[in-house]
Amino acid sequence: MAVTDRDIFTVTRLNQAVQGLLEGTFPLIWVEGELSSVSRPASGHLYFTLKDSGAQVRCALFRNRAQLMRFRPADGMQVLVRARVGLYAPRGDYQLIVEHMEEAGDGALRRAFEELKQRLEREGLFDAERKRPLPRFPRRLGVITSPTGAAIRDILSVLRRRFPGLPALIYPVPVQGAAAAPAIAEALRTASARKDCDVLILARGGGSLEDLWAFNEEIVARAIHDCEIPVVSGVGHEVDVTIADLAADLRAATPSAAAELVSPLRDEWLLHVERQRRLLVERMQRGLQHQALKLDNLERRLRQQHPERRLQNQAQRVDELERRLALAMQHRLRHRESRLARLQDRLQHRSPARALERLEAREAQLRLRLDSALRRRLDRFEARLAAAGRALHSVSPLATLGRGYSILTTAEGQVIRDASQVQVNDRVEARLGKGRLSCTVVTRYEG
């Protein structure tokens, strides 16, 4: 064969051809194996090797898928992956491009259960303080379960035995599979919104952990927490504990036990009804007695306030007031007559004419005494005034001047008492008994 007739592949072309062959032959497959060489760089992608006792294969799980995992992969874990077979052309290595990874076996479910349980417990969804009491005598029971399963048959059997008259409203849901958890949560929300029943039973028969997994979903736990009606969980057998059991207001070991807890015994109910009947009769009797007593009181008050009775009372009161008015008028009249007599007697003794005569005589006497006193007082004042005038004249400067003396003053009007107050040639003024003189100092003598 000539060289030109050969179909020669480049390395790149070969790897691309193998890549297309692998991807076309193995579109999506499930592979189980043990993790090793787990690596998670800063990019967020996950790289690891999947191996068993005879072989190994490289795997890549990209970041957008890795973020959806419910566990943290580690070396030695047994896992199940859903992947496409591919080839990394630059190195010629074939690998698995993983789209989903889960832990293999019940161990994975158990770890997921514990992680969710711890997270919800930290949020307080399981706190005893939020658990609500069950109604002692419910009017209607709601049951969320499969309409064809053994759980509903067991519940209805218990209800027929304990209390046949208790109506049960069934909310049919699937209790296993991918659609179960959303359907159960929606049934809880519907029952809470409608409020057609007083208590709810969430029930399912026994099964494996995987069979019961719908009752371990977070969406169901939160729907129970948000439900406004008390919820009793009766899922599986006594050894089975689900997240729904922990979130419910009360957990029952089985669906039958849940029905026992929420339904009263017929005899107990009848006893309760009889007790309520007696209480009602007693209350009615007390009420009737109370109303009868009120009626008697009203009749007595009506008799006391009857118009005829009131008119009689008013007539008696009018008579009494008339008698008291007559006595008061007589008493007042006698008092006025007595006072008038006293005033007349006093008037006779105190006649205005006599009083006027006495006043005129006293006035004349007082006039005489006043004139005499005024004359004597005026004479005394005149004598004192004359003496004061004589004394004043004796000390008056004018009198001194009249005896030949004079008063010298400076040109400024200052009285000169000492020769040192003036100088030779100073002008001085001399005041005489009559008139004034203007003088000039010719000579000054000291001492």
UniProtKB/Swiss-Prot annotation:
Q: Where in the cell is it found?
A: Cytoplasm
Q: Which organism is it from?
A: Thioalkalivibrio sulfidiphilus (strain HL-EbGR7)
- EC numbers listed for it are 3.1.11.6
Please give the GO cellular component terms listed in this UniProt entry: cytoplasm; exodeoxyribonuclease VII complex
Record's HAMAP family?
Exonuc_7_L (MF_00378)
InterPro entries linked to this entry: Exonuc_VII_L, Exonuc_VII_lsu_C, OB-fold_nuc-bd_dom
Please report which protein family the annotation says this sequence is part of.
Belongs to the XseA family.
Determine if Cytoplasm is one of this entry's keywords: yes
> According to the UniProt record, what class of enzyme is this?
hydrolase
Output the superkingdom of the source species: Bacteria
Known catalytic reactions:
Exonucleolytic cleavage in either 5'- to 3'- or 3'- to 5'-direction to yield nucleoside 5'-phosphates
Q: Which UniProt keywords apply?
A: Cytoplasm, Exonuclease, Hydrolase, Nuclease
The encoding gene is xseA
Read off the CDD domains from this record: ExoVII_LU_OBF
Q: What processes does the entry annotate via GO biological process terms?
A: DNA catabolic process
Q: What name does this protein carry?
A: Exodeoxyribonuclease 7 large subunit
Query: Looking at the Swiss-Prot or TrEMBL record, what is one Pfam family this protein matches?
Result: Exonuc_VII_L
Describe the task this protein carries out.
Bidirectionally degrades single-stranded DNA into large acid-insoluble oligonucleotides, which are then degraded further into small acid-soluble oligonucleotides.
Recall the taxonomic lineage recorded for the source organism. Answer: Bacteria, Pseudomonadati, Pseudomonadota, Gammaproteobacteria, Chromatiales
KW Cytoplasm (keyword) present: yes
Description of how the protein assembles with itself and partners: Heterooligomer composed of large and small subunits.
GO-annotated molecular function: exodeoxyribonuclease VII activity; nucleic acid binding
